[in-house]
A protein has these predicted regions:
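Alpha4 helix (beta4-alpha4-beta5 surface) of REC/receiver domains from two-component response regulators
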Residues: 63, 83-100, 105, 109
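Acidic, metal-coordinating helix/loop segments flanking the phosphotransfer/catalytic sites
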Residues: 6, 31-49
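Hydrophobic/aromatic residues positioned on beta-strands within the core alpha/beta folds
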Residues: 78-81
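Charged docking surfaces used in two-component/phosphorelay signaling
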Residues: 16-24
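Acidic catalytic/metal-coordinating carboxylates
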Residues: 34-37, 60-66
Length: 117
């Protein structure tokens, strides 16, 4: 059964590129354009991995990760951001993070590592 990945980014081009690459690699991918939509999807399905932009409208990655850690602890998280300085400040410095712009194939390698592949 393919691994379930949720890609969350309000920048549609970035989100679509990540989702396309992951689908090409055989992952089942859902997309969300903000944190609130992401949490609604997480409440309906179980995901192996969440790839999430840090700064988004309606609900930031900080709140999404906090809720995930309390209710879906088995879901791994990779953050993407243009503001890496915010991670330590908000207590998320322990999570893997890619600073925009980043190489999609570097992200793919990290996805495989995080998912134990």
């Amino acid at each position: 059964m393919p691994k379930q990945v949720l890609v969350v980014d309000n920048e549609s081009g970035s989100r679509r590129n990540i989702a396309f690459l992951l689908r090409e690699q055989g992952y089942e991918v859902d997309e969300a354009d903000d944190g609130l939509t992401a949490l609604n999807l997480v409440d309906k399905r179980t995901f192996d991995l969440l790839i999430c932009d840090v700064v988004m409208p309606r609900l930031s990655a900080f709140e999404v990760v906090r809720r995930l850690e309390s209710s879906h602890a088995s879901t791994s998280v990779i953050l993407i951001t243009g503001h890496p300085d915010l991670l330590d400040e908000k207590g998320l410095g322990h999570l893997p993070c890619f600073t925009k712009p980043f190489n999609l194939y570097d992200l793919l390698r990290r996805v495989k590592q995080v998912l134990g592949e």
